Regions:
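Residues that define the transmembrane beta-barrel architecture of outer-membrane proteins
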Residues: 16-20, 27-29, 65-69, 128-132, ...
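Repeated loop/turn-to-beta-strand initiation elements of outer-membrane beta-barrel proteins
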Residues: 30-33, 82-85, 142-146, 184-190
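Gram-negative outer-membrane beta-barrel transporters
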Residues: 39-41, 61-159, 242
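Outer-membrane beta-barrel architecture
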Residues: 11, 21-25, 36, 62, ...
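C-terminal beta-signal and adjacent terminal beta-strands/loops
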Residues: 151-156, 179-243
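Gram-negative outer-membrane beta-barrel proteins
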Residues: 1, 30-32, 41-47, 93-99, ...
Length: 243
């Protein structure tokens, strides 16, 4: 929208990123582990600020200074040939410094004006502070069972860090069962399987939209949001052939 429907006199600048990382991996016959520290220093990062074009479409704008920093940890354990455990986690801090929020003022459906609200430091939208992935895998001859789980922390849906415009943290698990065998003719390998998604029927949303506005007297802030609710427990079967 910035190029097709935005102001031709105020095209955004290219964003710049300096990424600093330091890590250490370890591996032997039954254990893998690693840690990685990172600091991502943005200049002129393009983000949504609430700015709109002439027809009300959202525009991205450059913010002078923002960053992402954190630590990534991973661990893999295989104590025997039929079991493996893999887990990884990320703790992060994702911030925009001196963020300026643009809030439109409406009279009904008519856009009257836009006011700017300055914030000292805000969380970057859709950037949870904590992520966790876990997987238990069991194999025996041609059988395989794997339980994969993911935890995602609370997320803000705008860069203004408005508590009313958030996605709640959630924890969801999927179970995969499969059997692989080798026919004697034509097909080298066949895998039959079934996957149970959202095994524990968690009610959660993993995406959405959000916006803020004022009514015409500028005394009533309106925070609006929509959420992408995800499916409850559902099952999918699959079959694959290798020739």
């Amino acid at each position: 929208n910035n190029y097709t429907d935005g102001d031709p006199d105020s095209y955004p600048k290219a964003e710049k990123l300096l990424d600093y990382e330091a890590g250490y991996p370890f591996a032997n016959h039954w254990l893998t582990a690693g840690a990685n520290f990172y600091y991502m220093d943005y200049t002129d990062q393009l983000v949504l600020t609430g700015a709109l074009n002439d027809i009300g479409e959202a525009l991205t704008e450059n913010v002078p200074d923002s960053y992402r920093m954190g630590i990534e940890l991973m661990l893999g354990i295989k104590p025997c040939k039929w079991f493996q455990w893999d887990i990884n986690a990320t703790w992060s801090k994702n911030r925009i410094k001196n963020f300026v929020e643009n809030i439109p003022i409406y009279d009904g459906w008519n856009l009257l004006d836009v006011v700017s609200v300055s914030h000292k430091s805000t969380r970057i939208a859709f950037s949870p502070d904590f992520l966790l992935n876990n997987r238990f895998a069991f194999t025996y001859q041609g059988f395989e069972a794997a339980l994969q789980s993911q935890f995602v922390g609370k997320q803000y849906m705008t860069n203004a860090e408005v508590e009313a415009l958030t996605l709640d943290k959630y924890f969801v698990s999927n179970l995969n069962l499969a059997y692989t065998f080798k026919p004697r003719k034509v097909v080298k390998e066949v895998t039959l399987g079934v996957t149970v998604y959202n095994l524990f029927n968690e009610e959660y949303e993993n995406n959405g939209w959000a916006s803020s506005s004022y009514d015409k007297d500028v005394n009533h802030r309106i925070d609006s949001a929509g959420y992408a609710a995800q499916a409850g427990t559902n099952v999918m079967g699959h079959v694959s052939f290798r020739f």
